[in-house]
Each structure stands twice: as structure tokens, then as C-alpha cells.
Amino acid sequence: MSDRDSQNDLGAKVFVLVTGANSGLGFSICCRLVDEFLKSHRHPRESLTVIFTTRSTRKGNDTLLRLQDHLRRASASASAPAAASARVTFVAENVDLSNLVSVRALSRRLNKTFPKLDAIVLNAGLGGWTGINWPKAIWGVMTDLVHEVSWPSFKIAPAGMVTDAQTALGDDKEPRLGAVFCANVFGHYMLAHNAMPLLRHSDMLHGPGRIIWVSSLEATVKHLDIDDIQGLRTLAPYESSKALTDILALTADLPSTAPWVKSFYSVDEQPEPRKETELEPPHPNMFLTHPGICGTGILPLSWPLFYSMLAAFWLARLLGSPWHTISTYAGACAPVWLALSAQAVLDDAEAPYRRNGGGRVKWGSSCNRLGQDQPVCTEVDGWGYGGVVGPAILEGDRRRRRKRGAVDLTAEEKLQYEDLGRKCWQRMEELRIQWDELLDEAEAQAKSEA
């Protein structure tokens, strides 16, 4: 087989990594990847490999069985069920995103095992909430239902939650690491950087590799303090981490962030020197998404309260909320669209915003009253609709219900957001380099003591 034939075969194979897949949104993303792939990629040579992560082997095995069962059902409607089923492969991996040693170990296994990654869906997360302010929740739902079940103000979280020690170097050498920050942002950030060789090898026919950050509708820049980027002093560490996620993804292609983004996209180790005539592969594209408001277990509730929450979500949808997807399968709409669509489709979707001076878009899963889902642009505090100054430019965005108190983006606010993006990228790269050095030192120490 010639090199070109080999490359064509690899180009027909799609590899997608999904973190946090044992339940909820992550599991539904895996299921929907299968469904959408079998619908849109019908050639018998085209295949999909879904690499999913859980926190334990037991959870991984259980998730694998449930995904295989879903694949059998999805393939049953195909003209050749066995052939359709054979084109999809699941691979279970373990990782604890609050443990940087675990993240590094996963990265090494991925780089040794797979030829490329076409997309990584950074979904796993930690809420960090310890309870609910019930009087405030009941009053808010009774008097302002749609707003309170979209942007709730009644969740309780403590400040100062930190991870367990990452290394054996001791407290004098190892700085504190925020638990929610690490699980939601920094663990993924380290994983994406370490997987850069695979993302850069992506030769999928519809564009470069994709880093897809799963954020939240609740993210707002007011929750982020650049001097407390890990959210150790805030009582809203989850919202702070998701605001940071938004900022990193939306400002990744700006000139002001370029020095640090280039460092993030760099490959630490080149297994073979590149030939003089060989072009450097393009860096991945970074995308931002959220699942709308769906029923997951990220906020621990008893079953009666969980179903009461779903009932409130249904009522909010009937009252005109565009974001209450309710089911995690509908919530997976936008992440899967970003993972599998041709690059031209994504470019066309962003084009109206870029033509009007904007940039990256936060793509959210949206539902109408009948439950029909679609990916749509989400308004972001400080970034507006796709970074366009002024009112929404698309009719769909103008008609969509806004957050109460939302105002049109001003040029000054956009500049402030871009400057915040520059500072966040700088801090994140400094943290990554610091922790890579600490992990290297810990590994060297462990080897010397062995």
C-alpha cells in the first residue's frame, strides 16, 4: 500500500475523545456521535473510534456495555446492521482530571496507542456545590421561574476547595491547586496540550483537529477574578471555571493572545525531525459549546427533587426558554455538531459574525417547545453575540429570549474582554509550564528512589 493510500485510509477514520462519559451529558455525547456518524458517513470505509474516559475501570466497563447496547440499537435500522456496527469502535480509558499525574499518564497512553485525534470533547466537570438555599430557590422559582432555572442564584458552594497533593515533593514546593478549577479547566488544558501531537496529525477531510470546550449557560465574566484565576476565594468556583473556559476559547485566535496560544499549541517532543520540505501541520481549531439546561447529576438531588427539577425545566421551555433541552441527548446536539461537521459548515456558521467584526461563537444546544434541537449562538457577557459590537445581527439571535438585564456589547467592553483573555492565557501557560516542571521533578525523584 502506498503512503497516499495509507493516508486516505487514515483520513476515512475519525477518532474522537470524550471525557466524563460514564453518565449524563458525556454518555449522551458518545451515543449521539454514533447516531450522527452513521447518518452522515455512509461509506463502508469510513469508521468512528470513540475514546471515552471515566474515573475507574469498573465505570469504564459498565459504560462500554451500555454504549455497545446503544450501537446495536442504532445499527438495527441500517440496511446492513452488522456492517454499520463494525464501523464504530469504543475504547475505554481511565483518568482523574483532578490528578495531573493521571492526566499525564492518559496523555502518554493516547500518544502511544492512536495515530491521531480529530476532536477532543472536554466535557468532564465538577460542580463543587454542597447544598441549596431552599427558601431562596422556592421564592425564585415561584416568582421568576425561567430566569432562576436558567441562571440560578440559590446553589451553595464553599470557597477554598483544593485537590489532594499532586506529587510527593511536599507542600514547600507544590502550590495549592483549586479542585473545581483543576477538574473543569486545568486538567483538560494539560490533557489537550499533551495530546497536541495527535491533534496536529488529524487529517480528517473536513479540517484540522478540534479542541471542543464544554462550558455552561451560567458562565459570566463577573464571576472571574484574574487575581484568583483558580477560584479559591470565590463562593462560585464552578461559574468562575466556566467563565474562564469561555474566555480561553473565545480569545484563542486573537493577536493579543497569540504568544501564549502558540506555546499551548506547541508539541513538546518531536519523535522524528521534520524534513525540510515537510510543512508543519496546522494547529487545531478551538471551539466553545454548552448543552443548554438539561437534567444531569452534577447537582446532587434526591429522586423526587430531581423530577421536580425536570418539571420546572419543562415549564420553562413552554414559557419560551430556548435553552431547556432537558434531556442530555438533546444537550449533546451542539458538541456533536462541532465534532463531526465539515469545517466548511462551521466556517459558514461563523461567517456572519466575522464579517461584522466578530470572531469565535459560543455554540449552545437549543430547543423549541416541541423539543426540536439545534446549535445556536449564545450571548456572552463581555463578548455579545459572536464578538460583534452592538445588537444581534442575525434574526434568530434577535428573536431568542435573552438573559434578564442583558445589554448590547460595546466596543469598550469587548476590548476589556480581549485584554482579560490575554491575561488568562498568560496565567494558564505559566501554570502549565510550572506544573510540567514539578511533574518532571517528581518523576525524576521517584526514579532515583526506586
Curated annotation (Swiss-Prot):
According to its UniProt record, where is this protein located? Endoplasmic reticulum membrane; Lipid droplet
Q: Which GO terms describe its molecular function?
A: 3-beta-hydroxysteroid 3-dehydrogenase (NADP+) activity
**Which topology term describes how it sits in the membrane?**
Peripheral membrane protein
- What does UniProt list as catalytic? S215 (proton donor), Y238 (proton donor), K242 (lowers pka of active site tyr)
Biological process, per Gene Ontology: ergosterol biosynthetic process
Transmembrane stretches, start-end: none
Record's SUPFAM superfamilies?
NAD(P)-binding Rossmann-fold domains (SSF51735)
Stated EC number for the protein is 1.1.1.-
The UniProt entry, under InterPro entries, shows: Ergosterol_Biosynth_ERG27, NAD(P)-bd_dom_sf
Q: Does the keyword Transferase apply?
A: no
The record's note on quaternary structure and interaction partners says: Heterotetramer of erg25, erg26, erg27 and erg28. Erg28 acts as a scaffold to tether erg27 and other 4,4-demethylation-related enzymes, forming a demethylation enzyme complex, in the endoplasmic reticulum.
| Miscellaneous notes | In Aspergillus, the biosynthesis pathway of the sterol precursors leading to the prevalent sterol ergosterol differs from yeast. The ring system of lanosterol in S.cerevisiae is firstly demethylised in three enzymatic steps leading to the intermediate zymosterol and secondly a methyl group is added to zymosterol by the sterol 24-C-methyltransferase to form fecosterol. In Aspergillus, lanosterol is firstly transmethylated by the sterol 24-C-methyltransferase leading to the intermediate eburicol and secondly demethylated in three steps to form fecosterol.
- Function in brief: Sterol-C4-methyl oxidase; part of the third module of ergosterol biosynthesis pathway that includes the late steps of the pathway. The third module or late pathway involves the ergosterol synthesis itself through consecutive reactions that mainly occur in the endoplasmic reticulum (ER) membrane.
Know the name of this protein? 3-keto-steroid reductase erg27
Source organism (scientific name) = Aspergillus fumigatus (strain ATCC MYA-4609 / CBS 101355 / FGSC A1100 / Af293)
